[in-house]
Amino acid sequence: MDKTVLDASLEPLKGKTIAVIGYGNQGRVQANIMRENGLNVIIGNVKDRYYDLAIKEGFEVYDIGEAVKKADVAFLLIPDEIMKEIYEKKIAPILEGKKEFVLDFASGYNVAFGLIRPPKNVDTVMVAPRMVGEGIMDLHKQGKGYPVLLGVKQDASGKAWDYAKAIAKGIGAIPGGIAVISSFEEEALLDLMSEHTWVPILFGAIKACFDVAVKEYGVSPEAALLEFYASGELVEIARLIAEEGIFNQMVHHSTTSQYGTLTRMFKYYDLVKEIVKDEAKYIWDGSFAKEWTLEQQAGYPVFYRLWELAVQSEMAKAEKELYKILRRKVSD
């Protein structure tokens, strides 16, 4: 099988009822694009504002269990941390009675780490967008596709890969974007590696830069924030990386900048690599999944404590004042 898919047929999904479970960030976007593509879509959601929104936008909306009963295909587009409980209570009992069914996940986490184990009669596929719902819709309105990872954990019908590719087309990823053949385990590893390594390292580096510049060198908080991220330069660099490549975009910076970046990247590389290796192992062997499950069961004590430390930091307080001056969105 080719590792990339640039287009596919919708035929496997035609005539089937597709239940999108969760009308939030991904669910709303995927449901609307599939409806535009002529597919029969219903929504399964708890009775909240998203339930009401789906009705307002013209969908038939049901309790989650009822939606699964009516469907041939279900997309589980609810947060990872609540998915296991909802699956076990409202979805699993119904799947046992289905002769043939397709269950689609937008992330690999719950299946990869054994938190959800669909019955053997169910095609278990993954179509995982590599961007948030708002970004997907922006590209869709421009007639463009976007990248997704495809995976099959269980091929009960012998057609699971056909379903996965058809879903990628149905939600507007292809044509125009790219679908990369992957796996639940690979997606979960890569997603968590980002969240556990370069993202916190970047955030931590920015906070350390702020603290050192302001506290030890007397730099004004406003100047520090604007230099490190508030000006929007970081966003522009990220855009250039996506469009031109991480090293190719460096030509847009001064030679001084290029020299400083390259010398320090290689200077700290071995240190950073060891951090990445440790985190990757911790993710891959299931240790993080256990840690996160215990944190949830305990009522999120570490999560809330660290959030409080972050928002009460001097950088966060200075940011709030600067953003008021700049008339940007400020959370209370």
Curated annotation (Swiss-Prot):
Residue span, KARI C-terminal knotted domain: 183-329
GO molecular function, one term: ketol-acid reductoisomerase activity
Protein's GO biological process: isoleucine biosynthetic process; L-valine biosynthetic process
Record keyword NADP present: yes
Class of this enzyme: oxidoreductase
Domain of life the protein comes from: Archaea
InterPro entries: 6-PGluconate_DH-like_C_sf, KARI, KARI_C, KARI_N, NAD(P)-bd_dom_sf
Pathway noted in the entry: Amino-acid biosynthesis; L-isoleucine biosynthesis; L-isoleucine from 2-oxobutanoate: step 2/4; Amino-acid biosynthesis; L-valine biosynthesis; L-valine from pyruvate: step 2/4
Domain KARI N-terminal Rossmann: 1-182
Catalytic activity: (2R)-2,3-dihydroxy-3-methylbutanoate + NADP(+) = (2S)-2-acetolactate + NADPH + H(+); (2R,3R)-2,3-dihydroxy-3-methylpentanoate + NADP(+) = (S)-2-ethyl-2-hydroxy-3-oxobutanoate + NADPH + H(+)
NADP is among the record's keywords: yes
SUPFAM superfamilies: 6-phosphogluconate dehydrogenase C-terminal domain-like, NAD(P)-binding Rossmann-fold domains
Coiled coil: none
Keywords assigned by UniProt, alphabetized: Amino-acid biosynthesis, Branched-chain amino acid biosynthesis, NADP, Oxidoreductase
Family per similarity comment: Belongs to the ketol-acid reductoisomerase family.
Name of the protein this chain belongs to: Putative ketol-acid reductoisomerase 3
Species for this entry: Saccharolobus solfataricus (strain ATCC 35092 / DSM 1617 / JCM 11322 / P2)
